Amino acid sequence: MEIEETKGNGMNLEQLTENRVEEALIKLSSTDESHAAWAGQVKYLEEGLKQAKSHSFLLAEGTVAEREAKALSSVKYAEAVLAWTEALKAFKKIDNERNHEMRIIDIWLTLSSNRRQGNM
């Protein structure tokens, strides 16, 4: 059974050492702040999406359906969607990297427990 590293090189379970777990912990602690910042930015830009849509809706004329369509196709809303999408991509990238490191730690904990119990 192999664990796939994010960079594409395989890692055998026997190679999962305390050093690798330490690397995972360092990676997690070094990305705490940026992870939180990107999560906050995504939330902030979600509000920006609502504001851009509402602003464009209020400026549009026509029926409610027409105003809704104009708001969703406005430049202001498109810019807000682009900003939100870029922030979400950055957040997901760091979130996925952190989840990978957490899986490494979880697997190591399981293997260590199994070794202590003599199951491996």
Give residue ranges: language-model regions.
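Extended alpha-helical coiled-coil "stalk/arm" regions
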Residues: A39-K70
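Extended, surface-exposed interaction regions
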Residues: E23-L49
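Terminal, low-complexity, charged helical segments
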Residues: N9, L16, N96-N99, N119-M120
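Short, charge-rich amphipathic alpha-helices with coiled-coil/heptad character
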Residues: E2-E33
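Short, glycine/alanine-rich amphipathic alpha-helical segment
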Residues: E61-A90
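Long amphipathic alpha-helical coiled-coil segments
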Residues: A39-V42, E47, L82-R116
